[in-house]
Design a protein with these regions (language model features):
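Conserved small/polar residues in nucleotide/adenosyl-binding loops
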Residues: 298-301
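N-terminal signal-anchor module of multipass membrane proteins
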Residues: 3-87
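A conserved active-site cap/scaffold subdomain adjacent to cofactor or substrate pockets
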Residues: 210-229, 246-250
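Transmembrane alpha-helical segments and their boundary/interface "anchor" motifs
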Residues: 66-71, 86-116, 123, 127-164, ...
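Membrane-interface helix caps and helix-loop-helix hairpins in membrane proteins
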Residues: 119-127, 265-272
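Long, well-ordered mid-to-C-terminal structural blocks that present hydrophobic/aromatic surfaces
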Residues: 227-294
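Transmembrane alpha-helical segments
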Residues: 76, 80, 136, 140-144, ...
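Long hydrophobic alpha-helical segments that form multi-pass transmembrane helix bundles
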Residues: 150-220
């Protein structure tokens, strides 16, 4: 009789990850509106600043509201190494893993299209979506994670961030108005690619914040989450929970500093998903995960 594979301890779910996901879901479900209303009950400089952080900047800049989407993508990345280890322990083949990745990515893209009004048949509809970006970015990151070792994965993330910076800095939109900044909505190559290749209607007519080219650095966000999850999984026996939380907190500080310094030449911008934005939200996500992890540590399913 063929022995039944057992589930490794490393595939146990992290209560801290579930708690962080729940925290993020609060804001996805509209908790920011409640925060703003409470702030209005107590006028003042601090409450005004908190209320302002519950909305997106018009273009360049950063607020707490900008962290909700990338944190969710980062969390999806963290959980993948645990899911992958479990699938492999149950005998999944490489083909099985590919099919599961593609199915999940395709379903998220489909759900995004449905949310945008697929069944209303009101063409041209918007085809890009938050769910679609999560599906595409996560699936591409999972494919890369599946096929490369850790050092190569880190190199890929670095190449994406530096390459995206170079592309946006050096290649303006061919149809940009004279004098348009390469990081403006009118002048960026990101919007040009949307107008050229993105089916349907972009969100801003000339640009879509969940468009094609800006999904590439979102892949880096998902991969950074996967690298974090792999670090936690592989260091289970070697490091204490507090030590792992400390290392993640230090990495959070490093990423945040890199993002702030990079902002001097490559503005932090969620709609463009700039490389500086990737670094800052990676710092935020790592810091939040370290905080939740330190408080809750491991738990059995």
């Amino acid at each position: 009789m063929k022995p039944q594979p057992t589930q490794p301890a490393a595939s146990q779910r992290l209560l801290s990850l579930d708690a962080l996901r729940g925290f993020d879901m609060l804001f996805i479900m509209g908790f920011a509106t409640l925060v703003v209303n409470v702030c209005h009950l107590f006028p003042g400089d601090v409450s005004a600043a908190v209320a302002e952080s519950m909305s997106h900047p018009a273009w360049h800049g950063f607020s707490h509201h900008d962290t909700i989407f990338p944190l969710f993508l980062f969390i999806a990345g963290i959980s993948y190494p645990f899911s992958l280890a479990k699938q492999r322990s149950l005998g999944a083949t490489q083909g099985d893993l590919y099919r599961k990745i593609l199915k999940r990515g395709a379903l998220l893209i489909l759900f995004g299209l449905i949310y945008n009004g697929l069944f209303r048949l009101d063409w041209p509809m918007r085809t890009a979506s938050v769910l679609g970006r999560i599906g595409l970015a996560w699936a591409l990151a999972a494919m890369l994670f599946l096929n490369f070792r850790t050092r190569t994965r880190i190199g890929i993330v670095g190449a994406i961030l530096v390459g995206y910076w170079a592309l946006l800095a050096l290649v303006p939109a061919p149809d940009a108005p004279a004098g348009a900044d390469v990081y403006s909505m009118e002048g960026t190559i990101v919007g040009y690619i949307d107008r050229l290749l993105l089916p349907g209607r972009p969100y801003y007519k000339i640009f879509d914040p969940e468009g094609l080219l800006s999904t590439v650095p979102a892949v880096a966000t998902a991969m950074l989450g996967m690298l974090t999850g792999e670090f936690v999984r592989l260091s289970e026996q070697r490091l204490s929970g507090n030590r792992k939380a400390l290392y993640m907190a230090l990495a959070a500080v490093a990423f945040t500093l890199v993002g702030i310094l990079w902002d001097l030449s490559f503005p932090i911008n969620k709609k463009l998903w700039t490389s500086s934005f990737v670094c800052v939200v990676a710092g935020y996500s790592l810091g939040m995960f370290a905080l939740f992890y330190c408080c809750l540590l491991y738990t059995s399913p």
